[in-house]
From Swiss-Prot:
Domain of life of the native organism: Archaea
Keyword Lipid biosynthesis: no
GO CC annotations, alphabetized: transcription preinitiation complex
GO molecular function: DNA-binding transcription factor activity; TBP-class protein binding; zinc ion binding
NCBIfam families: PRK00423.1 (NF001658)
Gene3D superfamilies reported in the protein's UniProt record: 1.10.472.170, Cyclin-like
Name of the molecule in the record: Transcription initiation factor IIB
Keywords: Metal-binding, Repeat, Transcription, Transcription regulation, Zinc, Zinc-finger
Signal sequence annotation: none
Name of the gene this protein is made from: tfb
Zinc finger residue ranges, TFIIB-type: 2-34
Length: 300
């Protein structure tokens, strides 16, 4: 039998709940009976049954980064359990873990998403890039595009595609190094996925200028050099010199030229290492830009 609340001031048993303040007050004298009450109800409002059904939820939100989208539950650990019960719960947890990835498709998805987590963490990519890569991979699985390709190459290709879609500057070489997959293999998977998921060149286009700050930071170049490099790249783009060229190679050459023009010289080897391209690539792009744009580089 529950004891009825009584106001200690006036003896009234009538109370008012104020949800905004989290208080229960006496309806007669206004004395605060309880305060700091946590509202366990929903944070939304519904005006009919259908709205209530749509807006109601329980548990944690779904996550595309988990193979089961976070919809399963885990059997917890209680150290106060006796030996036999603890052993029983251990077995249950073990079986539950197996059942969560009970078939090959689930196991492959779980492995792919763990690999995605590793790659994006090491590349220090933002969460929205990781989520976009996961979405692309799930779509590729749904369309049967994984067959005949390694999971590692496809997940790496999805990371590269996500970076390009969201204009986050990362080169194929960087992703290849972290993914531990040959650059050519990732490139093949990337082109295949882009073609079959309708990722058009327009969607995937990354302006070479997006890479300028990234490379300039590593080379320790000033804002003046960066601005000059961007000017060179924008002029090259206007004249149609960037089509079909690697953004990394173009940026490396533009930064090399800008560093010479602004008196902050960096060697071709230095810029090539930062851009993860060969010195030959830097040299070829350098010659093209200087000749086609009529840039007079000081002789050093």
């Amino acid at each position: 039998m529950t004891k009825q609340k009584v106001c200690p001031v006036c003896g009234s048993t009538e109370f008012i709940y104020d949800p905004e303040r989290g208080e229960i007050v006496c309806a007669r004298c206004g004395y605060v009976i309880e305060e700091n009450i946590i509202d366990m109800g929903p944070e939304w409002r519904a005006f009919d049954a259908s709205q209530r059904e749509k807006r109601s939820r329980t548990g944690a939100p779904e996550s595309i980064l988990l193979h089961d989208k976070g919809l399963s539950t885990d059997i917890g650990i209680d150290r106060s359990l006796t030996g036999l019960m603890r052993e029983k719960m251990y077995r249950l947890r073990k079986w539950q873990s197996r059942l969560r990835v009970s078939d090959a498709a689930e196991r492959n998805l779980a492995f792919a998403l763990s690999e995605l987590d590793r790659i994006t963490a090491q590349l220090k990519l933002p969460k929205h890039v990781e989520e976009e890569a996961a979405r692309l991979y799930r779509e590729a699985v749904r369309k049967g595009l994984i067959r005949g390709r390694s999971i590692e190459s496809v997940i790496a290709a999805c990371v590269y595609a996500a970076c390009r879609l969201l204009k986050v500057p990362r080169t194929l070489d960087e992703i290849s190094d972290i993914a531990r997959v040959e650059k050519k293999e990732i490139g093949r998977s990337y082109r295949f996925i882009a073609r079959n998921l309708n990722l058009t060149p327009k969607k995937l286009f990354v302006k070479p200028t997006d890479y300028v700050n990234k490379f300039a930071d590593e080379l320790g170049l000033s804002e003046k050099v960066r601005r000059r490099a961007i000017e060179i790249l924008e002029e090259a783009y206007r004249r149609g010199l960037t089509s079909g060229k690697s953004p990394a190679g173009l940026v490396a050459a533009a930064l090399y030229i800008a560093s010479l023009l602004e008196g902050e010289k960096r060697t071709q080897r230095e810029v090539a290492e930062v851009a993860r391209v060969t010195e030959v690539t830097v040299r070829n792009r350098y010659k093209e830009l200087v000749e086609k744009l009529g840039i007079k580089v000081p002789i050093t």
